[in-house]
């Protein structure tokens, strides 16, 4: 089956928000629980929804913690977000070649739009599925299924690209092919344990992979 649709995660995949996310967690946690959390303690928080993460820390303060996190995140967004090499050119080329492209993210829509505008990727994506659009987040298949439905695409004709196991397992649960990115903060070896179909060393690796898949 040929691939005509590519779904991307956003954070850590299309744009480098790692420092923004880590700083947002550290600021919030230091405000409420001074000196209890270090940088390495918050790395596992990257990937799950804010609600899931903060529920495990203090169920009585979840909404308060999310509000604090998002305020810091918005205030410092543009200074801490960076681009990844070859992302813009690759997505531009995919659109030029006629691929359907969408984003499936666990972020809130307002912050997603900030990141897409800053990176100038907003012109390329017709479909962006955020946490505001679904009941279940990745690795549940619902967000991917919603994106595929909106793009009028079939799972077997789609590839999910991401930097976290939520993306890879989410793709597998939805029935798509999967590609992991080696620049993940979690480390290449960690993602390899989830058996993605492909591993990208840079985003432009996608182009020959898709070309080969669609030739066979």
From Swiss-Prot:
Which EC main class describes this enzyme? hydrolase
* Molecular function terms from GO: inorganic diphosphate phosphatase activity; magnesium ion binding; phosphoglycolate phosphatase activity
User: GO cellular component annotations, sorted alphabetically?
Assistant: cytosol
Against SUPFAM superfamilies, the record matches this protein to: HAD-like (SSF56784)
Disulphide bonds in the chain: none
Q: Which residues form the active site?
A: 9
Enumerate the UniProt keywords alphabetically: Hydrolase, Magnesium
State any GO BP term from the record: DNA repair
Q: Which domain of life is it from?
A: Bacteria
Q: What is its EC number?
A: 3.6.1.1
InterPro entries membership: HAD-like_hydrolase_sf, HAD-like_sf, HAD-SF_hydro_IA, HAD-SF_hydro_IIIA, HAD_2, HAD_sf, PGP-like_dom2, Pyrophosphatase_Ppax
Q: Reaction(s) catalyzed by this protein?
A: diphosphate + H2O = 2 phosphate + H(+)
The family database entries (CDD domains) matched by this protein are listed as: HAD_PPase
Named cofactor requirement(s): Mg(2+)
Note the HAMAP family from the entry: Pyrophosphat_PpaX
UniProt function note:
Hydrolyzes pyrophosphate formed during P-Ser-HPr dephosphorylation by HPrK/P. Might play a role in controlling the intracellular pyrophosphate pool.
Q: Which family does it belong to?
A: Belongs to the HAD-like hydrolase superfamily. PpaX family.
State the NCBIfam families in the record: HAD-SF-IA-v1 (TIGR01549), HAD-SF-IA-v3 (TIGR01509), HAD-SF-IIIA (TIGR01662), PRK13288.1 (NF009804)
Matches recorded under PANTHER family? PHOSPHOGLYCOLATE PHOSPHATASE (PTHR43434), PYROPHOSPHATASE PPAX (PTHR43434:SF26)
Q: What name goes with this protein?
A: Pyrophosphatase PpaX
Q: What is the lineage of its organism?
A: Bacteria, Bacillati, Bacillota, Bacilli, Bacillales
